[in-house]
Regions:
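Patatin-like phospholipase
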Residues: 1-40, 48-138
């Protein structure tokens, strides 16, 4: 019996994460799993789809909504002071337009951690995400 364990760490990097999304799809194609998954920024946003078993979702919604003025651009920048609309990206898209399967995600026995920065200390913290919809603000 082996005590070896293997975790997957997913980097951030905005649209550079599209390469990561393709690798995650490949992992799903070949049924490759890990003992834990850790993601920061885009790695966290894209990595949850591995546990929800939603192959192709990241690439699909980024291609579909990338040119949507409500999703990314000057409109969200003026309204929310963010180049990407957090309401649209984290609420409208995953709940209505390209649904995220939070129930399938919660069934996974693989723990998923989002890396966040403690604004008081500047140090990283690792938050286990048990429900994407319930912990979206992380």
């Amino acid at each position: 019996m082996s005590d070896e364990r293997c975790a997957l760490v997913l980097e951030g990097g905005a649209m550079r994460g599209m390469y990561t999304a393709g690798v995650l799809d490949c992992f799903m194609d070949y049924d490759i799993s890990f003992d834990a998954v850790i993601g920061v920024s885009a790695g966290a946003l894209f990595g949850v789809n591995l546990l929800s078993k939603q192959r192709g979702r990241v690439i699909r919604y980024n291609k579909r909504f990338n040119s949507d003025k409500n999703y990314m651009g000057i409109r969200p920048l003026l309204r929310e002071k963010n180049i990407v609309s957090t309401k649209y990206a984290y609420d409208t898209v995953p709940r209505e337009l390209d649904p995220f399967d939070d129930e399938e995600y919660k069934k996974s026995d693989i723990p998923f951690y989002a890396v966040v920065t403690n604004i008081r200390t500047g140090k990283p913290e690792y938050v286990q995400i048990k429900s994407v919809f319930e912990q979206m603000d992380v």
